[in-house]
UniProtKB/Swiss-Prot annotation:
The keyword Lipoprotein applies. Residues 1-514 are extracellular. It comes from Influenza A virus (strain A/Duck/Hong Kong/231/1977 H3). Its main location: virion. GO terms for molecular function: host cell surface receptor binding. One of its GO terms (cellular component) is host cell plasma membrane. SUPFAM superfamilies: Influenza hemagglutinin (stalk) (SSF58064), Viral protein domain (SSF49818). It is a single-pass type I membrane protein. A lipid is attached at C539, C546, C549 (S-palmitoyl cysteine). This is Hemagglutinin.
Amino acid sequence: QDLPGNDDSTATLCLGHHAVTNGTIVKTITDDQIEVTNATELVQSSSTGKICNNPHRILDGRDCTLIDALLGDPHCDVFQDETWDLFVERSNAYSNCYPYDVPDYASLRSLVASSGTLEFITEGFTWTGVTQNGGSNACKRGPANGFFSRLNWLTKSGSTYPVLNVTMPNNDNFDKLYIWGIHHPSTSQEQTTLYVQASGRVIVSTRRSQQTIISNIGSRPWVRGQSGRISIYWTIVKSGDVLVINSNGNLIAPRGYFKMRTGKSSIMRSDAPIDTCISECITPNGSIPNDKPFQNVNKITYGACPKYVKQNTLKLATGMRNVPEKQTRGLFGAIAGFIENGWEGMIDVWYGFRHQNSEGTGQAADLKSTQAAIDQINGKLNRVIEKTNEKFHQIEKEFSEVEGRIQDLEKYVEDTKIDLWSYNADVLVALENQHTIDLTDSEMNKLFEKTRRQLRENAEDMGNGCFKIYHKCDNTCIESIRNGTYDHDVYRDEALNNRFQIKGVELKSGYKDWILWISFAISCFLLCVVLLGFIMWACQRGNIRCNICI
């Protein structure tokens, strides 16, 4: 399609930007729906379905809970002295020893999980006047009755159970975790049969704390043939402190201590299989990539993970505003320039030129403007990831029934944090998208102004992103405009001459209407003047008589 007013003595140069047939809708601060040429999804919404064992050291709990492994349940002996970054508890885990409860289960579980080890050191406790190593048919170790391997069930010796008073100092330079307990028989007869006294008491103290527990005799629901229970407690003995155990019966004594370590180990409930693969971020659903700043797979995470948000999708604009090319314009399509629409078919570039001159038509990219825009946009995704990825884990929170109000408060706090981060994510992405679109528009305007300053009076802005050049401009001339070496003085005289010649015969449509109306008005006025003059002349000659009647 020939451009208006184009001949061998003139040329047309249009500036335009990249466009695609089907763009991507993104959100900005000023517009909820704006189309761009390209965008990147920021929300990871699916997992691999498996837990990767690298770079984190994963310990599969299989059919054991962490607490059962800690106590030494016979079917969990394989976990003795194990270490982990993440302990994975399965839904099919079960206890297979004497029924027990842990009054502060969640705290103990979290404490041991964060320590990342079940390293156990046996100590030489002296229990005089009692029978050690009690067992139960509810806790078989092989064919024989057994018990938790990390605990020592003490019962009467003969017909006596003396008051026990044992001291164990911590002379090491690390903290020690002692696990102990108290037995609650189901009947008074069982109480006296095992411990002689009608009621037992256990006191465990350090310089910093003291716990006093009294046995609670009574029948409970039968579990593995037992209606009695054991309550498990724990005490941390700091370096330089002393552990003191005093009891007159019902004591489930420690055999040693667990070495406490500080670290970023954790625990997670999941039934996802463990596989040989690499992933920094783990959720109960499986590992997920952390190349996006946000995820909505699961609130519970371990490792360097995207921030959890409620949104299913958030798109970051990585391209410019998209204005699809009008396909009805023929060969040149969007020759009108960037003000009307974009240009499709531009490969690997964002900005460019199209021209028509005596040598034909052509198109070329402006790599400098393209690179300037790309350089500023490329780092956006990494910057958003740096702002949002958590370098720590979000663990499960558990509370006992008596801590219901605390649990409600914790849930409220977590939900509020998620709401806040979801809102922050929306605003952050909208701001970045607004900046991207403003940036790419600015680069287009810079290129247009640069071209205008070069051409000066040698060309006319056609108002649609194009310039009409009023001198012969071959391909070499066009190239000089594109690369910034154009010398307008060389063509100045020719351009002025051609401009006057063309303006003499070619009027802009905006002025043509005015001139037509003015010409029509003048013609009507002259016609009226001539007609009035003829009437007056005829009246003077007597050829026309005018009678006025009242």
